[in-house]
A protein has these predicted regions:
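N-terminal cap/lid segment of alpha/beta-hydrolase-fold proteins
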Residues: 21-69
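Alpha/beta-hydrolase active-site loop
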Residues: 130-155
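C-terminal catalytic histidine-bearing segment of alpha/beta-hydrolase fold enzymes
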Residues: 251-307
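Alpha/beta-hydrolase fold nucleophile elbow
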Residues: 156-168
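Cap/lid segment of the alpha/beta-hydrolase catalytic domain
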Residues: 81-94, 109-139
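Short beta-strand element of the alpha/beta-hydrolase
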Residues: 70-79
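Helix-coil modules at protein/domain termini and other flexible surface or pore-lining loops
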Residues: 295-383
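The feature captures the conserved acid-bearing segment of alpha/beta-hydrolase catalytic domains
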Residues: 187, 193-258
Length: 383
């Protein structure tokens, strides 16, 4: 599903602004204030496939609910760009997924593993993972466990109830961690997990899929908690069939996992986590409800209220300087949504999960927001 996102970075805050997904944390970056987003650091010791061992700082992005908690935890893990692009792979910010999880009642910790972003350099413990899947998996999983230990120092986190999740190599990391059965772990969510793919050089043909099946089948015997595996048909890293074989190896090895397969998403289904929330959110929500986390968290548009006509720009409760943004919203394709804040700010989105993205884009500046319009209807009720 094609996604178009638009949000204005200066609608609710004065002073320097400018946030970009994956960019290094800079003085001008606008953090998600409503999620209490911040970057903390811990240390981790890891080995590469050659036996070289290093101890380095691991930056951890934090998203959390209001209040003191303690809240259950999700450790969310990033993927790995191809070698040509890894140097520019910045801080991982799965903000929209984190918004859902925080609304569900979780603290979300996102470690930027060693060899990425601020620790990119000569030491890469995930190098040649295609040849040594176990070495790279353990290096990555060790940093999940280091993040868990760090979380025990945070008073708002309950580490006796936690989940692990991730996308691509972060999904591989998730499976490896579940296979270690750490204390307090309740489940794992694997978005498009794997390693050894190259969508440009060999689309749909990872370099060592048999080794992946063997490795996951072997570590499955130690797994104790259920998993949810989510893959998209047009994944250009793994193709449509390899993930099913990997899942079968995991289950036949003695582990529990539900496989959720989705149709094509965008030009490369490998990125369905970001581009196909409309489809995966209900599936993940059902999984979390089964684990006991039943708080509603998926943003849905209310019924039309008749407050104003959809094209009545002057009726929109935003500052006068923001009226033009609503006019732009009216030119967007459906599905689309427009949210307003209590301070006259706004956020809008068109495409996948438009309602949730619009509200998130609006309230990331720290002010409460509500949907004003969805598709061709005004859904806002004056407060």
């Amino acid at each position: 599903m094609r996604v178009f996102l638009a949000f204005f970075l200066a609608v609710q805050l004065c002073g320097p602004v400018g946030a970009q997904e994956g960019s290094p944390l800079a003085a001008t970056e606008v953090l998600a204030l409503d999620l209490h987003e911040e970057v903390l650091r811990t240390q981790a010791t890891v080995k590469d496939m050659f036996g070289r061992q290093e101890t380095m700082h691991v930056p951890i992005t934090v998203y959390r609910p209001e209040g003191d908690g303690p809240y259950p935890l999700v450790v969310f893990n990033h993927g790995r760009a191809t070698d040509a692009k890894r140097a520019s792979q910045g801080r991982y910010r799965p903000e929209m997924a984190a918004r859902y999880l925080v609304a569900k009642g979780f603290v979300v910790l996102v470690p930027n593993r060693i060899g990425y972003w601020q620790t990119f350099g000569s030491f890469d413990p995930e190098y040649s993972g295609c040849k040594s899947i176990d070495a790279m998996s353990m290096a990555a999983s060790n940093q999940v466990l280091a993040t868990l230990e760090f979380a025990k120092t945070l008073p708002y986190v309950d580490t006796s109830r936690w989940l692990v999740a991730g996308q691509s190599v972060g999904g591989l990391t998730t499976v490896a961690t579940v296979g270690r059965a750490p204390a307090g772990l309740l489940g794992g969510i694997n978005f498009s997990g794997g390693t050894g793919g190259d969508p440009d050089a060999r689309p749909g043909r990872p370099c060592n899929p048999v080794a992946m099946s063997q490795y996951w089948g072997e570590i499955a015997k130690n797994a104790k908690v259920p998993m949810l595996w989510l893959y998209w048909e047009n994944d250009k890293y793994w193709g449509p069939d390899h993930p099913k074989v990997w899942h079968r190896a995991w289950v036949e090895g003695g582990a529990q996992a539900t496989f959720a397969g989705f149709g094509p998403s965008g030009s490369n289904g490998h990125f369905g986590l970001n581009e196909d929330m409309d489809h995966w959110l209900p599936v993940v929500d059902e999984f979390l409800v089964r684990l006991g986390f039943d708080k509603p968290a998926i943003v849905k548009a209310p019924q039309p209220t008749g407050f104003a006509a959809i094209d009545a720009v002057d009726a929109v409760p935003v500052r006068p300087s923001n009226k033009a943004a609503y006019a732009k919203f009216l030119d967007m394709a459906k599905p689309r949504a427009f949210a307003v804040s209590t301070k006259g700010g706004f956020g809008y989105a068109s495409g996948d999960y438009a309602a949730g993205r619009a509200v998130g884009n609006c309230q990331r500046y720290g002010n409460p927001c509500a949907l004003y319009a969805a598709d061709a209807d005004v859904v806002w009720t004056p407060q």
